[in-house]
Amino acid sequence: MSPSLVAPEPEHCPGPESEQAGQGDACAGCPNQQICASTPKGPDPDIPIIRERLSQVRHKILVLSGKGGVGKSTFSSLLAHAFSANPDSMVGLMDTDITGPSIPKLMGVESETIHVSNAGWSPVWVTDNLGAMSVQFMLPNRDDAVIWRGPKKNGLIKQFLKDVDWGELDYLIIDTPPGTSDEHLSVNSLLKDSGVDGAVVVTTPQEVSLLDVRKEIDFCRKAGIRVLGLVENMSGFVCKNCNTESQIFRATTGGGKRLAKKMGIPFLGAVPLDPRIGMACDYGESFVDGFPDSPAAKAIKQVVRAVGQLVGEDPDTVLPDDTAE
């Protein structure tokens, strides 16, 4: 039971029911500090509910990035579309970027709303085998700002995990905000007993992005999250007329491949820039299905095969290899 607080939670509050309640840096000077510190602590009673709810989800994969603007949410949508290109796979895409939800737009379902049944919240189905969940589906107006502090954001993420009726899924892709914020800590603590397969980290070639990616990888290691590998997004531009590759964002310090080697994690692949990706996202369509022979689509499919293999699946079962054609 939540303690009765005498003042609103401060920014970066760890939450009155968390193990750090009354002890975190944000607690210093808070009127609620003694109340939170004296509240009996114990295991979160919702953890077993979440574990049971997600017991039918075979693989849970986080998508992370150290810096915003590297195409993480776009890549999450591409990953979900590519996994669902196999009609035998059931795929879910959960948007935990509470204050900047973009998944509904990327998937072409931004006008949809959440439906509630006796079984829980129903995800919005993009296709027969691809569902999505986002706070955007709960807003009266798609342009409404979500101005929430940490505890409220964490509460919604908990609801997504324990109340959404995904049913049987082969893959649940969890798109997260940039950096290492409350949302990441919440997802990690709530899923620690549910068997997260690991995280795919997205970067761009420039050192300014790699700098933050190093911090993201360090966060994963400290939090006990397996890093499945690193993807370099916006890696060069291939002209569709002459097939000449140009480096738009130059890898001044060796790019993602060198960083992955230095950090001791797999390098999953490099996805080149393609303006048609942006066009497909604006229209909420699958770039992988629309332009299957493009260098970017082939690179994305190879990343999907690699991720599938890392979580214990046969890559040819995950997605047939068409690069040899």
UniProtKB/Swiss-Prot annotation:
A GO BP entry: iron-sulfur cluster assembly
Record keywords, A-Z: 4Fe-4S, ATP-binding, Cytoplasm, Iron, Iron-sulfur, Metal-binding, Nucleotide-binding
Keyword Membrane: no
Binding positions for ATP per the UniProt entry: G66, K67, G68, G69, V70, G71, K72, S73
Any GO molecular function: metal ion binding
Disulfide bonds: none
Region (Disordered): 1-26
Cited InterPro entries: Mrp-like_CS, Mrp/NBP35_ATP-bd, NUBP1/Nbp35, P-loop_NTPase, YlxH/NBP35
Record's subunit section: Heterotetramer of 2 nbp35 and 2 cfd1 chains.
Name of protein: Cytosolic Fe-S cluster assembly factor nbp35
Organism: Aspergillus oryzae (strain ATCC 42149 / RIB 40) (Yellow koji mold)
Organism ancestry: Eukaryota, Fungi, Dikarya, Ascomycota, Pezizomycotina
